[in-house]
Structures are given as structure tokens and as C-alpha cells.
């Protein structure tokens, strides 16, 4: 007896699907190495060794995360990070402090704190006040320079200024813009400062020896209009005696920030270099006033290579800045040029090839492929 027509058709369709699946699986190549967790026998989970503590699990997870694998992560595909051990440190050496002296100082501080009954009573009653200035001074003296270095690496300052070379800013650099007669806008390490607030030269302070010489540099890393790998020099003060910036030689007068409209946030950095001796900066001197952007084109790496035998980077402070109304005044009145305006053109959204019979698709599926913006929803 012949089989029904629908049964024969089903058998043919099943065979065709099986052939197609087998053909697609045959094109798959085996992995280049063991897959994650392939060495774990999951047939009997109760017999597996338990961690029994979160700390033991954390150590094992960190060990596996840092172990070399045959595959690459998303970050390794797009970011070519160098080993921190291979980076060149161009900064000052760390201050030498005796380990015994540090332990004795901590022990003495704890003994004084325990002997103070008023501090103990205030802490118990939750009325104790913490001197934030003393906390910040202690932070800048101990772990603050390393935190600043990590922030600078996060914002890509070392990568774009020194092509990967790094340094620890051991000298605390304090920069503040005057806003009125009493208010100050501080520059920390990545905070936002508007061009209006930075229209005048800031107040720069740092601790220095009496007979030392310094160089202060203020640049814009992202604002060059013609060269993508160049910076704009906004301020350069050289041969500064001790911490008296006003008595230094102003090799380049101060120019307010002018991030172009539509270009987003720009990174502005203050770099402090310690000089070993007086340096002749005649080749780096700009005329005063200097309102030609071609004369303010600057390469920090070339500047450092030229004088690296006599100066060392020691301090760092930077902020982010974006366009406001004062930038228009800077372009028109100071730079005497038309203001450039940028606009980000988003790429068109990707849509797969339209199907003639979109099975199990909503009615608004057709809106993706219509030339007009008139929706189909509510028409039919």
C-alpha cells in the first residue's frame, strides 16, 4: 500500500534539513585549544572540590583571569596594551622613607589616639570632626601620586603626550582659576572647567626648594584643527625660581581654551618639570601677543626630548573643557578667524535584507524599509 502524500513529503523535507545541517556542521573548525571549564567533570558535581570560602574562590578566579589563554578578549582585540613593566619611567625617583621609621610613626600615632579620651568619647557619641585638609595632605604624601598616575593613564595622557612613557607626579600641583574676588575654580584630575572660567591665567602653587628651577606647561591635547597628533600651546613659563611662577620667564603668553563647537570634551593638562640647571628656551619662545594658531602648534614629546637632559616631569593636573559662548569671542576677537563648527553625522541604522514574506513579524516591520517617515501603524 502506498504511503499518504503528506507522509512522503514530510520524509523528504526531513532528509533535506538533515543534509543541510550536516553540511553546515562539517564547515566548522575545531577550537585552537581547550575551551573554558572543559577540564571539569560535570557528571558528578557533588564530588567536586568546594572552595568553602569566598577568599579562596577570589584567588582562584584572579589566577585564571591572569593566566595566558589561546583566545583573546574584546579589549585585547582593539587595545594594544603594553606590559606596565615595559613602560619607561621618565619621572623623578620616589622619596626614600625608612620602613622602620614609618612603622614607628604609625605606632606613635595610634598610642596618642588611644590615650586621648576626648577623641574616644567624641567617636563614641558620633560628634567627632575629621580635618579634611589634613586627610588630603596625608593622601598627597602617601598614595595620592599613584592615584593621579592611574587617572592620567585612564584619560590617555601618557599615551598621547609621551607615547606610552609614564611618570609618577610626586610634586603636588595646585591650579585654581579665580572667579570673582573670592571664589576659586580648582583644577583636579579630570574635572570640568568651562572656557569662561578659564579665561584668565590661573594661580599655580606647589612646594619647592628655595634654589630650584621649574617649567610650567599648559596644553590642549584634542583641539588641533589640522594635525591630529599635535597639541596647542596655551601657556609656557620657564626658569621659574622656586614656586614663584610670576617671576618666571613667560615664553608663551596665556591663551584661553577654545574647544570648537560640536567637538565634545577636550583634555587640557598642566605639566610641571623640574630643571637641573637654567635652560635656554629661545627656540620655544613665542611672540607676545601670539594669536596665530600655527605658531602655537606644539609637540610635547619633541619638547621633552630636546630638554630631557636638564629637566624631568614632576607634577600633573588636568581638566576637561567643552564649548560655550566665550569660545566664539576668542575666535572672533583674539584669533581673528571664523569659528569652526563640527557636527557628528551618525551612520545609517543597519537593517537586514527585506524578506518578501516576513513570517511572524509585526506590522511595523515594513517601517524599516520605507523611504518616508510616515509610519504604517494606524494606516491599515
Swiss-Prot record:
Cited InterPro entries: PEBP (IPR008914), PEBP-like_sf (IPR036610), PEBP_euk (IPR035810)
Main location: mitochondrion
CDD domains registered for this protein in UniProt: PEBP_euk
Gene Ontology CC annotation, any one: mitochondrial large ribosomal subunit
Residue range of the transit peptide in the UniProt record, numbered on this chain: 1-26
Location in the cell: Mitochondrion
Keywords for this protein: Coiled coil, Mitochondrion, Ribonucleoprotein, Ribosomal protein, Transit peptide
Subunit note: Component of the mitochondrial ribosome large subunit (39S) which comprises a 16S rRNA and about 50 distinct proteins.
Protein family: Belongs to the phosphatidylethanolamine-binding protein family. Mitochondrion-specific ribosomal protein mL38 subfamily.
Name this protein carries in UniProt: Large ribosomal subunit protein mL38
Natural source organism: Rattus norvegicus
Encoding gene (name): Mrpl38
